[in-house]
């Protein structure tokens, strides 16, 4: 499959009538997975996105997801207190004030997911670069947490993005056990996009494709 088919995968997943709740997009580094995904999700709401590369805790992962959902910004480093302060929890605001620094991004995320669940609206959560997850993060616990969100909220859609060939033990065994239970479909990206639709001219397309081949 070519990289320029990734938008079709996202649209299919993000459809209320889709049979999928969780899919994986896998491809070699530099083939254009993240490029296509980031270009596509600018037009989608609500979307939570986190690249696991360089993230050192589960709390930080969900902090980045929450930040993207609430403020629609992309930052490599997230101030969790800033995230907590930015989230309007309505009737739960007094609880947030009582908890103070103990307040968890995951608590706020679950509140937001519940709001969309009650409205019957899809919310898409994207976890990129999962093969680069830090050794400081409990991979089994992370995947189990994502699975529990899927079980609790049927309108949550999950997109995992990775280079599966770069999974090594013990993460490989953990992932294989998890994916058999939860991932509905794995899409393998084997070719670069023929064109990059967000760029205006063939010259720009050619330049971008050449850049992606080298990175």
What role is predicted for each listed range?
Residues 8, 113-165, 172-174:
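Conserved Walker B catalytic segment
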Residues 21-22, 27-123, 135-139, 185:
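P-loop NTPase nucleotide-binding core
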Residues 30-31, 54-58, 163-168, 192-196:
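Conserved nucleotide-binding/hydrolysis micro-motifs of P-loop NTPases
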Residues 36, 40-41, 171-179:
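Short, aromatic/basic amphipathic alpha-helical patches
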Residues 1-14:
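N-terminal pre-Walker A segment at the start of P-loop NTPase domains
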Residues 51, 159-162, 188:
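Conserved beta-strand segments of the P-loop GTPase G domain that flank and frequently precede/overlap
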Residues 14-18, 42, 105, 114-120, ...:
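Conserved catalytic network of the ASCE P-loop NTPase/AAA+ motor domain
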Residues 181-214:
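Conserved small helical "lid"/interfacial subdomain of P-loop NTPases
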